[in-house]
Amino acid sequence: MRLQPLSVSLVLALTVPFALLPAAPLLAAPSASARQADAAPVLVTAAQWQQMASEGSRYPWFAKEQARSQKTLQKMMKAGIDVPVPRDKGGGRTHEQHKRNYQALLAAGTLYRLTGDKAYVDYARDMLLQYAKLYPTLGPHPEGRGQIPGRVFWQVLNDSVWLVNAIQGYDAIRDALSTEDRNTIESKVLRPMAEFLVSEPKNYDQIHNHATWAVAATGMTGYVLRDPELVEKSLRGSQKNDQFGFLRQIDLLFSPDGYYEEGPYYQRYALAPFLLFANAIERNEPQRKIFQRRDGVLLKAVDVLVQTSYGGLFFPINDAILDKGIDTEELVAGIGIAYARTGDDRLLSVAQQQKRLLLSPEGLQVAQALAANKAKPFDYRPMLLRDGPDGDRGGLAILRMNGERGQALVQKDTMQGMGHGHFDKLNWLFYDKGNPVVTDYGAARFLNVEAKRGGIYLAENRSWAKQTVAHNTLVVDEQSHFKGDWKRGEEHAPQVRFFQADADTQIASAMMRDAYPGVVFTRTQALLRHPDLALPVVLDLMQVHGDKTARYDLPLHFNGHIVSTGFEAEHFPAQRPVLGADNGYQHLWLDARSKPGSEPRSLAWLLDGRFYTYRFGSSAPSQALLVESGANDPEFNLRREPALLQRVEGQKDVTFFSVLEPHGEYNGTAEYVHGADSRIREVVRTRGSDAEVIELRLASGARIALGVADDSSAKGEHSVTVDGHAYRWSGSHARIDRSKGDGK
């Protein structure tokens, strides 16, 4: 798990080649005297520093960032150096002070190079010498969690983050220090910390974002200390057998499209060490061609991370904090490095939204390009991002219409996402008008808020946020997918059936086996545009096949204020029952419940001046339940959010079908309402011999039909008759429109 945001706005990124190590196999670490013979900076060259110092003030973005950094650091310097004995969890005083210290070390090294002011050197040196006194006295952190506590921080991950930052600041001042001070700092702090990280294989020899930070920290330290052995272990694993290490992580954690296994939130977090260390490798060993590895997957990952956002915020799948977005400092580093290597002017518009850049060679390039007005709009587009190292372990389908703040549908057909993954196969989210409309809870956590259990993941993360009922996908017999075992979940990925993205029809379909014994479910979703509809609509088809009768629940978590319920229901205004006893159900209040029925129903809500009408039905009698999160939550850790749950009892097979329609406008200031009535009159589902058709009947008389074959590989013709009209198509699926007056 991840606790600390990296202060990347000052990260010293690396661009042009600087050959330090030979192409031949690396040898044992050189002697201390040999390492000290050359103290020149290697993470950013002296020539690059000189260019930034002489040219940076000419470019407003760079000059503004430098001024901001100077103001922040001078405030820290005025407060004095504080290197406390570690004692607190995340968010506590000593924890936060050590964070501020690595930020200060990074800033001091940067500003020394940009200004030539030796006061910055003195400040950084004195702080590092205090760490040289403290670090040898430290054992496992007193608040350490799990099997691998850190020394400076309560988890070893944060020690890695400290070193990634501190080593860059140290590299910038190293040649301004005396030999004695260099020896003390390196032998008492930097080398012992790097060796501590390498000595913990349960953290270091892993395929995980924790290990990425660790290998980046040790590898960058190895380059600065001229220690080829440290570099080799960072690249190939502590045993140098290529089973772990940085290169193996690149090969296994990203799909060929650049999608990161743990999802966007953790892609954002891991992006900084991946790119910063890759830059260090490119500088010192350009013959490795690290940015070309796997067809440039690290640079693809930058584009993918921006693509997996809406309204500036990342899609909150898996253990995600909802307020993390493209202005996060890790992506500031990513945009700068990616722009320097690709020259893609569309990345500059992202930099403009971030309102930040690096005080680095890449940051200077971004500032120069922005001053030259080269920025172009970023190309947010529909896409299928394959998951898994070979791209065959499901994927994330993104359907988009009407630009960055238009309509976006995200169908989550990805792998488990390791321990940070949620039990939500074939889950979906929907965005419109800059807002999340069909929502995902993300993580139950208040990051670094000490009053909320020290800022760690709360107990409700396991009891609610990870559970399947907290998401918009199928629940069988009130059990979560894989019975809540993420390691079992890692073994089974969805199968992508098809994906299509045209101007008026975008569609994705996937199948999931093994989430429940004997149950197979398939979800097909489409984003459809039609001239008789005000805005694109979402069509959703969930087909479930089981080998025994079961209870099937299909939740829809939505954002907005309910306007109308198109079904009769029993209400519980005086006393709110709790929906269930476990697997997330214990956290749901039951507010209303309909009787079982087969007729299509509707629910309408209002969000940010726009209406949303959700029409839904099923092939077997179902109940509609209106629920809200927050039950059994004595510490008020959960947000109170509404959901609609469709429930079918005692069936082996069932098909759920629905359409979500955005429409109309409510303006409270001007006191008017336009288009509050749905333009869809009815949604009809019809089953054929080997396919299904969902037909939308519009108020205009037009009809939109989506035909979906059971076998997505079938090339032959399919036919389904709806009220006397035969819909025929070939292949896996087809959209078929009928205008008013078309005969049967």
Indicate where each model-derived feature is located.
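Boundary at the C-terminal end of the N-terminal hydrophobic targeting segment
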Residues: 23-28, 32-34, 39
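Catalytic and substrate-binding regions of extracellular carbohydrate-active enzymes
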Residues: 357-575, 652, 662-665
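Bacterial N-terminal signal peptides
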Residues: 9-25
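Aromatic-lined, polymer-binding surfaces characteristic
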Residues: 41, 46-57, 62-65, 74-78, ...
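Non-catalytic terminal regions with compositionally biased, polar/charged low complexity
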Residues: 644-654, 660-744
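Extracellular polysaccharide-recognition and catalytic grooves
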Residues: 185-425, 429-436, 572-584, 588-608, ...
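Positively charged n-region of N-terminal signal peptides that target proteins for export
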Residues: 1-5
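Short, hydrophobic/aromatic-enriched beta-strand segments in well-ordered soluble domains
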Residues: 556, 613-631, 654-666
